[in-house]
Amino acid sequence: MTVKYIRGDLFTHSAPTGKSIVLAHACNTGGSWGGGIAAVFARKYPKANRQYSEYCHKNSHLLGTSLLLKADDYDKSKAYIACLFTSDFNQSPEQIVKYTDQSLQELAKQLKSLPIETQNGNQVVNMPKINSGIFGVPWENTEAVLDKLDSLDFNVYVID
């Protein structure tokens, strides 16, 4: 497991030949990509946004789970969008961190059979500093979850 920090735009990450990439973000369970990085996902991937919203409205008990969607431009980008259900806006930062751990463990299982890019022998998940915006979780708390996951490596994109 490695957490690597990259200065730049998450959406410029490109797939190695023959592989797909994962762009992950923390999501609410209400079906709204309305603010923060989620709003950027909604503008960039309106079809995936509709799929996410429909999924949320048809399902319950989503906290601690993940939803993997193909990006609208999957044929070109080979990008999957990982929706990590970490909050419904009623959780403490500690609860959000717990749900982050659970959702990433589920994501790791979902990715096992897919041709996802690797580094250091692990599949890679690309993300911003999840939970640290609207959900208000100190980044160090989420980072601790990433550090202990043995099955995935993380590229965390930061913008100055």
From Swiss-Prot:
The keyword Ribosomal protein does not apply. This is ADP-ribose 1''-phosphate phosphatase. Substrate binds at residues 8-10, 26-28, 33-38, 130-136. CDD domains: Macro_Poa1p-like. It catalyses: ADP-alpha-D-ribose 1''-phosphate + H2O = ADP-D-ribose + phosphate. PANTHER family: ADP-RIBOSE GLYCOHYDROLASE OARD1, PROTEIN C6ORF130. Its EC number is 3.1.3.84, 3.2.2.-. InterPro entries: ADP-ribose_metab_enzymes (IPR050892), Macro_dom (IPR002589), Macro_dom-like (IPR043472). The keyword Disulfide bond does not apply. Highly specific phosphatase involved in the metabolism of ADP-ribose 1''-phosphate (Appr1p) which is produced as a consequence of tRNA splicing. Removes ADP-ribose from glutamate residues in proteins bearing a single ADP-ribose moiety. Inactive towards proteins bearing poly-ADP-ribose. PROSITE patterns: MACRO. Keywords: Hydrolase, Protein phosphatase. Belongs to the POA1 family.
